């Protein structure tokens, strides 16, 4: 039987739209070179002779230049390049036969596969062809996306019920489109029970484009109950999105569900939408919500009530509601979003000195997924240990944060704080073991704290050698890998940088050995993409590899002319790494520009204060100029804050006003009676809290990269004050 799916396929993204969204492959983009234009360096600073460690790294990188030369020096056939560009152009049109013919004419296998991958990633091609490509090419990226694209195509093209069922081969679909396609097949074969199950799952749990909803409801609406509609509405609004555009998009989708709800739920839904969108009439609409006829709590409504209470400073009412909410996912719809709301309320409680209430909000982590669970366990343990002075209560939480850690940063944090709890219980041998394990993670804030804890607070040398040297066989496999070759071809053909970024992003997790990943990082740097090289290095470190040489590059930082006594170079490198990963072309959503993310108004103030010409376009094109402006700003803020690195970094990330506000609310981390480690953990804005820790950790590694003796002096940095240095 043939299933006519045209009615349902109106929401499937077209090939031109997909290409535009995914890679921005306009004609101008295709012609544009992938690497940024070189930037100017305006002044020289004398450099000391390289140390033995630096010389060893130089030799290592020179050797890798030789080893990867066969792929780095690859010169694509100009005819192939033109066919590739033309195929990409036609893929964004209705001439798919022409695009396929051009792809088939490309002689270089890697270039031809690149053209196929771009088409399949955009959802152009038969569903089975897309799936076969994914299964046959594990070294190629965006695999989950391509599976979803295949399901989009299956829905768009339809076919026999046998063909559709064979496509899934008994597995559950991955997308709303896939569930709809499979539900259609079962419905056509007369299996209404399975069609109802699949359609219900699509509606309750998956994204469905607006243009797709009408056809879906026409076909499956009779299978959906008001409970299903309520569940879809809850899934959309049990959410803590900080982006106004994200909230608007979700609310627009939710609003289309409102007419499908029961009469009583429609009134509640209007109030919930108003709260979610932070509308002025939210309180008035909330006051009109009728009590539930069955006396049961509507936990979707309760979530919006908690949001409204917190935003209108009804703190204790919000804490009570959030603390007493069940942990059953069936009731809460999304426990992780409830956790985010609980965490926000917890920082409000800490700010107000209500430590018991804060602990009650975070004490139970039932039902959370891995990331929220490890953060919940840490917060509960830290509050119990440091604020409630109850190490017995703290220890099981901190042990849970240690054992649930899924990456090096959370691992180091869990080990370090478990050690602190064991110390407080005078279980010193066990505490040392925890510090030892944390200290192995050398490029983490808590790992560095653990190292200094073990040394009695003394400053320490950090010696870091280059990665493992690849064997001849590893080199052969690397330079012949088609996705590696495709990245070079994409770069030299002038394709959009995001194509290369996607290839490297997948390969950095796919390649197996330290030497493999080092070659990948080296290749990215050799192609002029320091940011991608750095990200490859970060992933390598997270996988337990020594990729410090690439994850913490030194050479991209420019020589510059300081306007005042500058911050130490390690600090500037640390900030640049955190702000832009040395990609000087970045402009933030707030308008910050260039290497160190300078706001135009900041540049104008610095130019006025130091009586120099202000040239805002140079913030993006001249790294030396950007460093001159930003170093003066950083130096000025730190001087105002009496040399405090902690407060200086808060001011740079969140603004000087926030630094002064948090001194008033949380105490002064420069004073002896305030523990700066605890002070950082009480910063209520997650981005700033993590920024301070990461930049301070970066500083320690960069001192080592700059061959400074006693590079690890984090404890001194935490307590730094100009009047007591």
Predicted regions and their residues:
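Catalytic glycan-binding domains that act on GlcNAc-containing polysaccharides
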Residues: 117-119, 131, 136, 314-317, ...
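TPR repeat positional signature
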Residues: 83, 111, 116, 147-150, ...
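Solenoid-like repeat scaffolds
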Residues: 69-77, 100-110, 120-124, 132-142, ...
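Compositionally biased, proline/threonine/alanine/serine-rich low-complexity intrinsically disordered stretches
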Residues: 30-80, 724
């Amino acid at each position: 039987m043939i299933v006519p799916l045209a009615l349902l396929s109106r929401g499937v993204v077209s090939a031109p739209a997909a290409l535009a969204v995914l890679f921005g492959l306009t004609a101008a983009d295709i012609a544009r070179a992938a690497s940024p234009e070189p930037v100017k360096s305006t002044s020289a600073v004398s450099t000391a002779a390289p140390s033995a460690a630096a010389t060893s790294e130089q030799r290592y990188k020179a050797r890798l230049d030789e080893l990867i030369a066969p792929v780095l020096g690859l010169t694509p056939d100009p005819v192939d390049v033109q066919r590739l560009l033309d195929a990409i152009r036609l893929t964004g049109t209705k001439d798919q036969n022409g695009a396929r013919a051009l792809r088939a004419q490309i002689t270089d296998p890697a270039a031809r596969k690149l053209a196929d991958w771009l088409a399949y990633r955009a959802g152009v091609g038969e569903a089975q062809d897309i799936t076969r490509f994914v299964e046959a090419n594990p070294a190629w990226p965006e695999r989950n996306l391509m599976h979803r694209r295949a399901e989009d195509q299956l829905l768009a093209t339809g076919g026999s019920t046998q063909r559709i069922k064979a496509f899934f081969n008994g597995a559950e679909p991955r997308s709303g489109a896939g569930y709809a396609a499979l539900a259609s097949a079962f419905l056509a074969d007369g299996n209404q029970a399975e069609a109802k199950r699949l359609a219900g799952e699509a509606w309750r749990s998956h994204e469905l484009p607006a243009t797709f909803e009408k056809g879906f409801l026409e076909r499956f609406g009779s299978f959906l109950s008001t409970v299903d509609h309520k569940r879809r509405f809850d899934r959309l609004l049990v959410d803590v999105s900080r982006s106004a555009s994200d909230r608007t998009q979700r609310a627009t989708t939710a609003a289309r569900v409102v007419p499908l709800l029961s009469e009583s739920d429609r009134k509640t839904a209007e109030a919930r939408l108003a709260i979610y969108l932070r509308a002025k009439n939210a309180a008035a609409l909330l006051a009109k919500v009728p009590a539930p006829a069955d006396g049961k709590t509507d936990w979707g409504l309760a979530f919006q009530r908690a949001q409204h209470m917190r935003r209108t400073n009804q703190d204790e009412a919000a804490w009570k509601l959030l603390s007493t909410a069940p942990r059953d996912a069936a009731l809460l719809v999304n426990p992780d979003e409830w956790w985010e709301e609980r965490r926000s309320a917890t920082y409000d409680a800490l700010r107000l000195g209500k430590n018991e209430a804060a602990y009650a909000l975070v004490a139970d982590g039932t039902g959370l997924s891995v990331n929220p669970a490890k953060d919940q366990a840490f917060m509960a343990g830290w509050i119990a240990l440091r604020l409630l002075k109850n190490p017995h209560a703290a220890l099981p939480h901190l042990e849970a944060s240690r054992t649930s850690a899924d990456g090096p940063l959370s691992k180091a944090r869990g080990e370090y704080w478990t050690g602190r709890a064991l110390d407080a219980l005078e279980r010193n041998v066990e505490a040392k073991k925890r510090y030892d394990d944390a200290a192995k993670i050398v490029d983490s804030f808590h790992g560095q704290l653990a190292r200094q804890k073990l040394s009695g607070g003394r400053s320490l040398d950090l010696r870091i050698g280059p990665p493992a040297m690849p064997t001849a066989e590893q080199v052969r496999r690397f330079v012949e890998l088609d996705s590696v070759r495709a990245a070079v071809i994409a770069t030299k053909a002038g394709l959009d940088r995001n194509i290369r970024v996607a290839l490297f992003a997948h390969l950095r997790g796919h390649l197996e050995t330290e030497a493999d990943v080092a070659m990948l990082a080296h290749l990215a740097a050799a192609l002029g993409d320091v940011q991608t090289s750095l990200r490859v290095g970060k992933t390598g470190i997270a996988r337990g590899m020594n990729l410090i040489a690439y994850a913490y590059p030194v050479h991209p930082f420019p020589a510059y002319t300081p306007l005042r006594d500058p911050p130490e170079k390690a600090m500037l490198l640390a900030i640049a790494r955190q702000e832009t990963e040395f990609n000087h072309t970045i402009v933030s959503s707030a308008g910050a520009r260039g290497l160190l993310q300078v706001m135009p108004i900041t540049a104008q103030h610095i130019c006025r204060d130091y009586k120099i010409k202000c040239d805002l376009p140079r913030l993006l094109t001249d790294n030396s100029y950007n460093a001159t402006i930003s170093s003066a700003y950083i130096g000025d803020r730190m001087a105002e804050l009496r040399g405090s690195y902690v407060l200086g970094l808060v001011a740079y990330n969140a603004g000087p006003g926030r630094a002064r506000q948090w001194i008033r609310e949380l105490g002064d981390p420069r004073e002896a009676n305030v523990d700066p480690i605890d002070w950082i953990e009480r910063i209520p804005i997650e981005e700033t809290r993590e920024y301070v820790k990461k930049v301070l950790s970066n500083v320690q590694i960069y001192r080592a990269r700059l061959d400074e003796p006693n590079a690890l002096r984090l404890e001194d940095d935490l307590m730094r004050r100009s009047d007591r240095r």
